[in-house]
């Protein structure tokens, strides 16, 4: 004991004289711990079950879509004989790819030159005889409607109903594609008219 009456070493309490803890309190503590643990496990299991059910539902949906796709593919006739062609392996380096592009470029240029060569005589036709969209009476009235302020979409729909090309409104200086046919029809009409006049 020190001067204040406190023990120097140990608690200074005789444990043999200390009363025991009540059994009811021990049972209450154990019951509370068990209840808390069981509630936590129940909640954890319910959350896991919900997630597993959603995953299983998604898997079922995927299986149904796959079965529908398989049925649609099986309904297409002659699909078993189709083979995938033209699949190229990726080039290992950039060098060979550049060489192949250079090697394939000259034939393309040559083909373009050969295609451009026969088209040159066609463009040598006199520009005065070419019927443009603005000069054609069928398209001229639609161009006037555009200038007045009529909606373009309505005009194009009307042109499509009448069998005309609505894209020609954007290029009024372009040549009418069926102008030659129209000229031939006019010539035929003139010739038939002259024959009828001779017959009279």
UniProtKB/Swiss-Prot annotation:
This protein's UniProt keywords: Coiled coil
InterPro entries: WASHC3 (IPR019309)
Name of the gene this protein is made from: washc3
Pfam family, one: CCDC53
Coiled-coil regions, chain positions: 56-76
Family affiliation: Belongs to the CCDC53 family.
Protein name: WASH complex subunit 3
Top-level taxonomic group: Eukaryota
Region listing for Disordered, in residue ranges: 87-130, 165-200
Assembly description: Component of the WASH complex.
GO biological processes: actin filament polymerization; exocytosis
One GO cellular component, as annotated: WASH complex
């Amino acid at each position: 004991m020190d001067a204040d009456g406190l023990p120097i070493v140990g608690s200074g309490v005789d444990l043999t004289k200390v009363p025991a803890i009540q059994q009811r309190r021990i049972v209450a503590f154990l019951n509370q711990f068990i209840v808390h643990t069981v509630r936590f496990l129940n909640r954890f299991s319910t959350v896991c079950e919900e997630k597993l059910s959603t995953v299983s539902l998604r898997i079922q949906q995927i299986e149904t879509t796959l079965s529908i796709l398989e049925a649609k593919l099986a309904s297409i006739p002659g699909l078993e004989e189709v083979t995938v062609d033209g699949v190229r392996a990726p080039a290992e380096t950039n060098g060979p790819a550049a060489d192949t592009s250079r090697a394939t470029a000259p034939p393309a240029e040559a083909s373009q030159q050969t295609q451009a060569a026969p088209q040159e005589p066609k463009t040598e036709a006199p520009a005065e005889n070419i019927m443009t969209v603005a000069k054609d009476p069928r398209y001229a009235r639609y161009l006037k409607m555009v200038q007045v302020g009529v909606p373009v979409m309505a005009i194009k729909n009307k042109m499509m109903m009448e069998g005309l090309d609505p894209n020609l409104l954007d290029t009024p200086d372009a040549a009418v594609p069926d102008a030659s046919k129209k000229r031939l029809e006019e010539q035929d009409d003139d010739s038939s008219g002259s024959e009828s006049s001779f017959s009279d």
